[in-house]
């Protein structure tokens, strides 16, 4: 299905128990970040254990993290399944996790090169569908994809517009896992999003 439509859904890509464990870990990390920031033990500009996105980022005021080590490990765990469903050999690029809050909205967009073969996985929280436009045409209505805990949408991030309407729930923990097709020109040089290895922050390139 992926090769034809450029997207597919993997139901129970990971177990609900594992999804809950990873989500609880990330929620606790947010709590640690909040406490340390409030007590001024860390700079508000420090992002090595996450940060709240600024006005120039996709979801202002929402806690997120590039390259959380648990999420990067999850990306490697999911890589064999990703290669199976896409029929491609992949290089891991990076991960990005968020704890969405009520009122958040993910605007329609396409992704950068490191997100060539992407996933979004539901780890925990209230339901929040994602939409994508399989034709690749900008501005079309698109299709709705519902993901339950542990489910994962696989899609061509650079080709298909994707978005989420305004979130009406309380909290939703999601992670994006990003890969490159090994046969794509430039993919090898882009491995790990041009970092020396996985787990490093975005500025370590």
For each of these PLM feature ranges, what is it?
Residues 87-96:
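A short coil-to-beta-strand element that immediately follows conserved catalytic motifs
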Residues 1-86:
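Non-heme Fe(II)/2-oxoglutarate
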Residues 102-163, 171-175, 180-195:
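Catalytic core of non-heme Fe(II) oxygenases with the double-stranded beta-helix
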Residues 99:
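Conserved active-site beta-strand element of glycosyltransferases/polysaccharide synthases
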Residues 191-205:
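Acidic/histidine-enriched, glycine/proline-rich intrinsically disordered or flexible terminal extensions
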């Amino acid at each position: 299905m992926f090769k034809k439509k450029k997207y597919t859904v993997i139901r129970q890509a990971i177990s609900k128990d594992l999804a809950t464990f990873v989500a609880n870990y990330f929620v606790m990390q947010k709590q640690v970040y909040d406490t340390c920031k409030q007590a001024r033990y860390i700079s508000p500009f420090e992002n090595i254990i996450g940060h709240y996105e600024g006005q120039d980022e996709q979801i202002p005021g929402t806690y997120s993290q590039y390259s959380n080590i648990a999420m990067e490990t999850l990306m490697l765990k999911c890589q064999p399944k990703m290669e199976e469903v896409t029929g491609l050999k992949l290089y891991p690029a990076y991960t990005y996790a968020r704890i969405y809050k009520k009122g958040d909205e993910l605007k329609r967009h396409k992704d950068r090169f490191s997100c060539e073969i992407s996933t979004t996985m539901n780890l925990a929280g209230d339901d929040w569908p994602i939409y994508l436009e399989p034709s690749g045409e900008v501005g079309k209505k698109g299709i709705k994809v519902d993901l339950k805990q542990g489910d994962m949408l696989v899609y061509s991030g650079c080709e298909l517009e994707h978005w989420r309407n305004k979130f009406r729930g309380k909290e939703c923990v999601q992670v994006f896992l990003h890969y490159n097709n090994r046969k794509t020109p430039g993919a090898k040089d882009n491995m790990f999003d041009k970092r020396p290895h996985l787990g490093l922050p975005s500025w370590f390139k």
